[in-house]
Amino acid sequence: MPTAPVYDEFALFHENAEEFGIPWIGSPAVRRVEAETSAGTISALAWGREAPELVLLHGGAQNAHTWDTVALALDRPILAVDLPGHGHSAHRDDHAYWPAGNAATLEEALRELAPEARVVVGMSLGGLTSLALADRAPDLVRQLVLVDVTPGVNREKASAIAQFIDGPEFFESFDEILARTIEFNPTRTVSSLRRGILHNAIEVGDGRWRWRYDLPRRGSGEGEDGQIIPGLDELWNAVERVGVPLLLVRGGTSPVVDNEDVAELTRRNPKARVVVVAGAGHSVQGDKPLELAEILKGLL
């Protein structure tokens, strides 16, 4: 197994491009930006030099770099956000990283960082957060894309994801954290998983590794209404209230969204569109980034 090199978050984009056959014409214009909110600092990656056209929100236990290949393929101004408690964004004292609270925090951040974005894209937890954001701040969400998630998500559908996230808090080496990640992602290349760990984990002082993200703690809201994520019933109601174009992108092999979820989504919002990406699991942006980029280009 390879060991971890010195980490530079802006030095790995050529690997993304090479793996997916994206022409490489030199390092893209990407920088870290921040917004101060009432819940702490929100950090994001700003792609391009113009005002963002798209806002990208990652899933739970991920970070803004999950969108790197999509961003390279799109080559448009993008803001890829680290959700609260993830990536370089601040951790909450109450460890409550649920859609409603995330949306309140991101409303503050996006009014500063991406007030005129044409599309908000959210995957998994980021998708539920973007749905809550569209409900509370519709002026910030002109088009909404949910990537492999609906409010119909439950523990059974997300069991494989939960099993991975509920793993050890610390790993004795980079090789150990890589081995576990490979075990749970057998369809992904080792190079992509290694790159993802470098973006999403940190080495602690004694040589061990841990994930960078903060997880919700017991008592922070989980299970209060018997659901894997609090407030899902209200998010179904939000689907009805969404007044902007709504697109659901399903991973063709993912169990997280089923046909009943699609039927409920389109019942509550008859104008919603659904696209299935063949061969993609839950992480559509990781499994089929070029296909997802083409879908998003069609919205611009």
What are these model-derived regions, one by one?
Residues 172-229:
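Conserved alpha/beta-hydrolase catalytic His-Asp/Glu region
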Residues 147-175:
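A catalytic-pocket lid/entrance helix-loop region that shapes and gates access to the active site
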Residues 1-52, 75-76, 114-116, 297-300:
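Alpha/beta-hydrolase fold catalytic core
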Residues 204-268, 273-276:
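Conserved serine/cysteine hydrolase catalytic core
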Residues 40-88:
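Conserved HGGG/HGGXW glycine-rich cap/lid loop of the alpha/beta-hydrolase fold
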Residues 115-155:
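Conserved hydrolase catalytic core segment
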Residues 38, 80-121, 294:
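Active-site loop/oxyanion-hole signature of alpha/beta-hydrolase fold enzymes
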Residues 277-289, 293:
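Catalytic histidine-centered segment of alpha/beta-hydrolase-like enzymes
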